[in-house]
């Protein structure tokens, strides 16, 4: 059994969850509060069936004990796995006529779009003048540069609210500073 758990480290991913999940007995997994206390960072093992559908298994305390006994830095490994799965940081974008980004959407088929906002070190390179993040659904992360016009901001806010209203796992219709949702000591910052 421990060999299977050790092998699962290659499929370990960080997952941002709403804190209401923690209040239910359905989410009895290791987690870390994020600076914005409505959200937490947890971890899951990703599985894909032969048809490519993704399913998750919550990390258990037993898994953590085995990884730590083997000297595996499991949180660092989850961060690395997320980066490797994010060769394309976003899947969709809207550009201005000058080629600058109005918004970038992380809606990868693995369902970890919201978790990709943890890649702040890499996102900072694309948005050196700053940006906001949004997580209308657990599977969607959105990056919005700080220099939007009022019209662009309204259009973006309307988009966020629409996605939030139809989300399968709703998170928030609001914009946040990246530091609100990334742990201070996160592993690539």
Show which residues each predicted segment covers.
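C-terminal structured domains
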Residues: 127, 139-189
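Charged, alpha-helical interface segments at or near domain boundaries
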Residues: 1-108, 115
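Short amphipathic alpha-helix segments
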Residues: 110-124
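Flexible, glycine/charged-enriched surface loops at secondary-structure junctions
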Residues: 90-93, 133, 171-174
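Structural motif
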Residues: 107-110, 145-147
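Short amphipathic beta-strand starts and helix->beta connectors
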Residues: 88-89, 123-130
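Short glycine-rich, basic-tinged beta-strand/loop micro-motifs
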Residues: 96-104, 134-145
